[in-house]
Amino acid sequence: MVLKDNVIDNWANALTKIAVKENKVKKMLEQAHVLIEVLKNKNEFVDILTFKSAHDEEKRIKIIDDTFSQFNIDEDIMNAFKILVHMQAFVNARDILKKLRGKLVELDNMTYGVVWSTEEISAAQIKEIEEKMSKKINKEVKLVNKIDTKLIAGIQVVVHNKVYDGSLRSKLDEMKYQVLKEK
């Protein structure tokens, strides 16, 4: 079952309130971020946990326990996953985690963004870019690398819907604009 956006938002709000009440904002934020990445492109796993015909509920809940408890995933997140399994709505887990991450980020003086590049960037390079962006916007920045083949060279960083463009393509566009402006 696919949940509506307002229901997904309610789940994220509930988990956010628990995180604040139990003073575990940072822990749940880190875990939400990791789980979002872990569940990306894991359609078969999500289907097994979502659809009743695949396995009975006890087996699906055991899969949750076996898979996530070994990584010390927060008990409240685990319980939310189990309820989603019961509701046959585990397909929404990643969306709920994304909303949760967004809400917790606001509370933790942190933000997430994307660094676009023509090829994959090393973890060390991402960390260096994160540090520079953190200084620039006075917030801790966590970046995810995504590939954009339209960039000619360089990188483009998007944080808070603001684009910081260091790509060759943007420089060429800027030169083109200046030439056209002078005509």
Curated annotation (Swiss-Prot):
The keyword Lyase does not apply. It comes from the Bacteria. GO terms for molecular function: proton-transporting ATP synthase activity, rotational mechanism. It is found in: Cell membrane. Keywords: ATP synthesis, Cell membrane, CF(1), Hydrogen ion transport, Ion transport, Membrane, Transport. The keyword Membrane applies. Belongs to the ATPase delta chain family. HAMAP family: ATP_synth_delta_bact. F(1)F(0) ATP synthase produces ATP from ADP in the presence of a proton or sodium gradient. F-type ATPases consist of two structural domains, F(1) containing the extramembraneous catalytic core and F(0) containing the membrane proton channel, linked together by a central stalk and a peripheral stalk. During catalysis, ATP synthesis in the catalytic domain of F(1) is coupled via a rotary mechanism of the central stalk subunits to proton translocation. This protein is part of the stalk that links CF(0) to CF(1). It either transmits conformational changes from CF(0) to CF(1) or is implicated in proton conduction. F-type ATPases have 2 components, F(1) - the catalytic core - and F(0) - the membrane proton channel. F(1) has five subunits: alpha(3), beta(3), gamma(1), delta(1), epsilon(1). F(0) has three main subunits: a(1), b(2) and c(10-14). The alpha and beta chains form an alternating ring which encloses part of the gamma chain. F(1) is attached to F(0) by a central stalk formed by the gamma and epsilon chains, while a peripheral stalk is formed by the delta and b chains. This is ATP synthase subunit delta. The gene is atpH.
